[in-house]
Amino acid sequence: MLEEKILNTITKYKMIESGDSIVIGVSGGPDSMCLLQALIQIKEKNKLNYKIYVAHINHGLRKEADGETKYVQDFCAKNNIECFVKKENVDKIAKEQKIGTEEAGRKLRYSFFEEIKNETNSNKIAIAHNLNDKVETILMNIIRGTGTNGLTGIEPIRNNLYIRPLIEIERKEIEKYCEENKLEPKIDKTNFENIYTRNKVRNLLIPYIKKEFNPNIVDAIDKLSKISTEEQNYLNKLVNNIYSNLLLEENINKEAKHNQIILDLKKFNTQDLVIKIK
């Protein structure tokens, strides 16, 4: 059962602890509605002690956006969950900041989620990234040219703040769960338009690889990600130890304009290139 798989992921990565307050980013789409419903059910069925809030942002990009906002608000009202909504003009913000619409939307969402976290005194923010999102990210990193760090993909938990309970769940499982629970999530039709790189990877590249090379490409890249993560963790420990041995003086202050690190140059020059880069 999907809820059991999600609970296993939560337990494995220690995402949620007793007494946590969690802000869930909910768009109204299949992923976030699956996450919201699952966390409600997991809490009730397992008698877990955590509080849920919902944060929804209306980007003002599509005519369907207001309907999606009402859908999320109605669902939350039905389930007695406090829902925070913000409406913005992302296109306008993107132009003002001279960045892409996708980047502007992402920055806006995360800023809003943290705002609600502070307002509700919550300590976790749950994001509905799934296994397919992780695989797409890794492929995008490879296309752009990445080091081994880019092969790790999306982290299950970051800074002990952002948690991703669906990170081991495939999109097809999420869609089935939504159907079984009669959630009727809202579908963003722009996800099927091959305008952005991610959409092209999702709609064109992965189906082609599945058909022509490996039907289990999602599992294969997930395996690559897990191996890369273990290797990165080991390498980071190694680099930290070497750094300590090379360090002569360190003066780091977040408030200061000029920070200073002094290393033993002779020892530094004896290190392998991969250590120097790190």
Description of each model-found segment:
Residues 1-26, 30-206:
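Core alpha/beta nucleotide-donor-binding catalytic domains of modification enzymes
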